[in-house]
UniProtKB/Swiss-Prot annotation:
HAMAP family: PPase_C (MF_00207). It comes from Lactobacillus delbrueckii subsp. bulgaricus (strain ATCC 11842 / DSM 20081 / BCRC 10696 / JCM 1002 / NBRC 13953 / NCIMB 11778 / NCTC 12712 / WDCM 00102 / Lb 14). Keywords: Cytoplasm, Hydrolase, Manganese, Metal-binding. This is Probable manganese-dependent inorganic pyrophosphatase. The gene is ppaC. One of its GO terms (molecular function) is manganese ion binding. Mn(2+) 2 binds at residues 15, 75, 97, 149.
């Protein structure tokens, strides 16, 4: 069987990399010939999880058509979040938990998406449906993905299925998920050593919102005031990146993983700022707004913005 590559979105997080690894194992057990790769380097949080459960970071690829004819996607489907030459290969499988947007294929494919907190939760269901045993290290990396995406089950994206998956995967992996989860999240909050340019690209995704192209980046911290000491530098870097890449607006969501609130920095024209205010009921003051209880880009940021821009 010809080889297929499995990967998550650009600027990969723990779900994108962890689920790619786990899905590659799953598919190889079913006779496929797959390799998990990544569209960017593993971040600090993901590196912590990989080391904890004995995995090497997947190799990074910029293109895929030079290697394979077919690919499998996890944790994304939108083309602007995927590999740049995706239109030159066949997508055979997708496992996701996001909205479906700008996605089309010539041939039928396997597509499974559910409104749960993490793609690894969907994969956990697939393991159970087929009565497949999950190795301890695979369980550990899937557990890490769910903890990361749901902020240790505190995110509003969290479902009962996510909670059940975490309980079961933690037992298989042999860890206390609450203790390990806090260690994992804290591993991803050390932003002091990174430049503002790195931080606004670390976990950033592009979205089509009505007629606007938006870039929405997110960083997790335990000290928001410390992060905001670099506010002017963040805004300057966002402005530069928006102009260079043709983004109509750029949002940086600084999320406190301990109290589940976010501070937003925003670059955009007056129309976009007005739509932001309409979407969240908050006026931007000096390009900044406080969004209490908002932690999920997928569920709490993109949907209200989409509705507001399309109204």
């Amino acid at each position: 069987m010809e080889k297929e590559l499995i990967f998550g979105h650009r600027n990969p997080d723990t779900d994108a990399i962890g689920t790619a690894i786990a899905y590659s194992y799953f598919q190889n057990q079913h006779g496929y010939n797959t390799e998990a790769v990544a569209l960017g380097e593993a971040n600090d949080e993901t590196s912590f999880a990989l080391k904890k459960f004995g995995f090497e970071a997947p190799r990074v690829v910029k293109t895929v058509a030079n290697e394979v004819k077919a690919i499998m996607l996890v944790d994304h489907n939108e083309p602007q979040q995927s590999v740049e030459d995706r239109d030159q290969v066949k997508v055979t499988h997708v496992i996701d938990h996001h909205r479906i947007s700008n996605f089309a294929t010539i041939d039928p494919l396997f597509y499974r998406a559910e409104p749960v907190g993490c793609t690894s939760t969907v994969l956990w269901e697939m393991f159970k449906e087929q009565n497949m045993e999950i190795p301890a290290n695979i369980a550990g990396i899937m557990l890490s993905a769910i903890i990361s995406d749901t902020l240790l089950l505190k995110s509003p994206t969290t479902t009962d299925i996510d909670k059940e998956a975490v309980e079961e995967l933690a037992k298989i992996a042999g860890v206390d998920y609450k203790e390990y989860g806090l260690e994992l999240l804290k591993a991803g909050t050390n932003i002091a050593a990174k430049s503002v340019e790195e931080l606004i690209d670390l976990d950033a995704k592009s979205f089509e919102l009505g007629s606007k192209t938006a870039r929405i980046a997110q960083v997790n911290v335990v000290d928001v005031p410390e992060a905001l000491e670099r506010k002017d530098a963040f805004l300057a870097a966002m402005e530069k990146d928006a102009k260079a890449n043709g983004y109509d607006l750029f949002m940086l969501v600084i999320t406190n993983v301990l109290d589940s609130d976010s501070e937003v920095l925003f670059i955009g024209d007056d129309e976009s700022k007005s739509v932001f205010a309409k979407a969240f009921g908050k006026e931007l003051v000096d390009s900044e707004a406080h969004l209490p209880g908002v932690v999920s880009r997928k569920k709490q940021i993109v949907p209200p913005l989409t509705r507001a821009f399309e109204a």
